[in-house]
Design a protein with these regions (language model features):
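C-terminal cap of thioredoxin/glutaredoxin-like
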Residues: 3-6, 10-33, 37, 105, ...
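Structural alpha/beta surface segment adjacent to cysteine/selenocysteine redox centers
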Residues: 18-119
Length: 199
């Protein structure tokens, strides 16, 4: 019986992009199902008292430099040569996160990948409705219709509810994954997830 890997997801996180590709490989190897749960990382930080690593660790001499080294190693290991840090990072992802809630299941997984490519490879501004609509249309979606759907009050509330529910489950950052009730934080935990799925 196929098991599900739930990705607590916000495309504002560079680690969400970096984790995505080896996670897809893991899903293919194990036959698991990938589910994406959109949240707002900023809201999660406010609810937990957490902060982005580059802010939180700035007071520790050498820590951010080492984190950058580890990121480069991860990029090299997984061949993530299309990764580009957007010039406007950090940015608001309210719009793309709401976009993800306009679809479900496999369609949401596909849309998440499209958004990651647009933001982290092509540099499309995540907070620019016109630019996002254009990128979505180019990828085969009805970009204007999807953008319009994000204004549904139910979509807006669902994003808030998802964020609060994730924190209630113990989440404090991105990327977080669940397999059943087992929580894993960080792209470095993908091996542990695969071991659990194989067990």
């Amino acid at each position: 019986m196929s098991r599900t890997v739930e990705f607590i997801f916000d495309c504002v996180s560079p680690n969400a992009y970096l984790a995505w590709w080896p996670l897809k490989d893991l899903i293919a190897r194990t036959g698991a199902t990938l589910a994406v749960t959109p949240v707002l990382l900023g809201g999660m930080h406010r609810l937990t008292g957490n902060a982005p690593p580059f802010v939180r660790d700035a007071q520790v001499k050498g820590k951010n430099a080492y984190a950058a080294l580890e990121m480069q190693r991860f990029i090299a290991k997984h061949g993530l040569v299309k990764y580009r840090m957007p010039p406007n990072f950090p940015f608001s992802t309210i719009l793309p996160q709401r976009l993800l809630l306009t679809v479900e299941g496999a369609a949401r997984v596909a849309l998440a990948e499209t958004l990651l490519r647009a933001i982290w490879e092509s540099g499309v501004p995540a907070d620019d409705p016109e630019a996002l609509a254009g990128a979505l249309t180019e990828a085969g979606y009805d970009g204007a219709a999807l953008i319009a759907a994000t204004q549904d009050p139910a979509i807006k509330q669902q994003l808030i509810d998802n964020t609060e529910a994730a924190v209630a489950r113990g989440c404090f950052g991105i990327p977080t994954f669940f397999v059943g009730e087992e929580m894993f934080f960080g792209k470095e935990r993908l091996g542990q997830i695969e071991e659990l799925l194989a067990g």
